[in-house]
Amino acid sequence: MSSLRLLISDSYDPWFNLAVEECIFRQMSPNQRVLFLWRNADTVVIGRAQNPWKECNTRRMEQDGVKLARRSSGGGAVFHDLGNTCFTFMAGKPGYDKTISTQIILNALASLGIQATASGRNDLVVINGEDERKVSGSAYKETKDRGFHHGTLLLNADLSRLADYLNPDPKKLQAKGITSVRSRVTNLVELLPGIDHGKIRTAIEQAFFAYYDEQVSAEVISPQSLPNLPGFTEQFAKQSSWEWNFGQAPAFSHVVDTRFIWGGIELHFDVLHGAIDRCQIFTDSLNPTPLEALAQRLQGAAYRPDAIDKICQHWIDDFPELQTELQQACHWLVEVLR
């Protein structure tokens, strides 16, 4: 039996790809060396310990249909589109060594005429003009008997969109968790016009085979053609769930405020595991009672616009004589929390 395994995903769904990655990692033989190549359509991928409300412009993402995906490894937030090629190297210990997988990527780039170097713990950089620019970022995960190294290569990504989704709204947000470090980046197409996913994928495959002096046939996987992956359905459900992608956020506080004709309101939220642990409302309204009632209702609710909207609608029903004013407040609150 070969010690190598090559998997290619035909899916652009980040939740599918991350679920496949996790299942293969858990079930692989400790003596195997696995290469998994994949791409995600418009997605912000965050590290295991990150806070999406701190890292991302969640409102803009929802408007533009950009998915949020939390990975099981550490590190920072990145934007993926089809101009990125994603790679995952997996191996059992003691064979797992992230310097080997880094070298395979460097060898693949060199075979295409691109001279890149490793920088720090996670990045690959190239010289573009007089500047050093990042073309690849990575993250890692290790267990007792195995490990994986995964990352992205910027081929022809829409770099203008990085600022759209990776700069959060200017909210009064105080949060714990790991903050992403923004780097100067460039696309490989700037160095090698005509490079595309097919070419870089082939180069990585050939560098993988050359390093281990062995070749295997690729296993192409998609939602219609899955390998035998026990537990995949459950893992996909987890990867695609609000509870994993948002609810795993570290504790944070969020303050929002606005002013209506009938008075100003300021809400202070303490959020723990994606739920409102504490809510305080301050107002100069002549009738603060409805807003005080809302603060009580929001306690324990999921910190998500649809859940808060549902609570607000029931709250409005309790004060029919103030329906217009409270609808204004509800609409504002749901929108500001997107």
From Swiss-Prot:
<dbReference type="GO" id="GO:0016979">
    <property type="term" value="F:lipoate-protein ligase activity"/>
</dbReference>
<feature type="binding site">
    <location>
        <begin position="76"/>
        <end position="79"/>
    </location>
    <ligand>
        <name>ATP</name>
    </ligand>
</feature>
<comment type="subunit">
    <text>Monomer.</text>
</comment>
<comment type="pathway">
    <text>Protein modification; protein lipoylation via exogenous pathway; protein N(6)-(lipoyl)lysine from lipoate: step 1/2.</text>
</comment>
<feature type="binding site">
    <location>
        <position position="71"/>
    </location>
    <ligand>
        <name>ATP</name>
    </ligand>
</feature>
<dbReference type="GO" id="GO:0005737">
    <property type="term" value="C:cytoplasm"/>
</dbReference>
<dbReference type="InterPro" id="IPR023741">
    <property type="entry name" value="Lipoate_ligase_A"/>
</dbReference>
<dbReference type="InterPro" id="IPR004143">
    <property type="entry name" value="BPL_LPL_catalytic"/>
</dbReference>
<keyword id="KW-0067">ATP-binding</keyword>
<dbReference type="GO" id="GO:0005829">
    <property type="term" value="C:cytosol"/>
</dbReference>
<keyword id="KW-0963">Cytoplasm</keyword>
<feature type="binding site">
    <location>
        <position position="134"/>
    </location>
    <ligand>
        <name>(R)-lipoate</name>
    </ligand>
</feature>
<protein>
    <recommendedName>
        <fullName>Lipoate-protein ligase A</fullName>
        <ecNumber>6.3.1.20</ecNumber>
    </recommendedName>
</protein>
<keyword id="KW-0436">Ligase</keyword>
<comment type="function">
    <text>Catalyzes both the ATP-dependent activation of exogenously supplied lipoate to lipoyl-AMP and the transfer of the activated lipoyl onto the lipoyl domains of lipoate-dependent enzymes.</text>
</comment>
<keyword id="KW-0547">Nucleotide-binding</keyword>
<dbReference type="GO" id="GO:0005524">
    <property type="term" value="F:ATP binding"/>
</dbReference>
<feature type="binding site">
    <location>
        <position position="134"/>
    </location>
    <ligand>
        <name>ATP</name>
    </ligand>
</feature>
<dbReference type="GO" id="GO:0036211">
    <property type="term" value="P:protein modification process"/>
</dbReference>
<dbReference type="InterPro" id="IPR045864">
    <property type="entry name" value="aa-tRNA-synth_II/BPL/LPL"/>
</dbReference>
<dbReference type="InterPro" id="IPR004562">
    <property type="entry name" value="LipoylTrfase_LipoateP_Ligase"/>
</dbReference>
<dbReference type="Pfam" id="PF10437">
    <property type="entry name" value="Lip_prot_lig_C"/>
</dbReference>
<comment type="pathway">
    <text>Protein modification; protein lipoylation via exogenous pathway; protein N(6)-(lipoyl)lysine from lipoate: step 2/2.</text>
</comment>
<feature type="domain" description="BPL/LPL catalytic">
    <location>
        <begin position="29"/>
        <end position="216"/>
    </location>
</feature>
<dbReference type="Pfam" id="PF21948">
    <property type="entry name" value="LplA-B_cat"/>
</dbReference>
<dbReference type="InterPro" id="IPR019491">
    <property type="entry name" value="Lipoate_protein_ligase_C"/>
</dbReference>
<comment type="similarity">
    <text>Belongs to the LplA family.</text>
</comment>
<dbReference type="GO" id="GO:0017118">
    <property type="term" value="F:lipoyltransferase activity"/>
</dbReference>
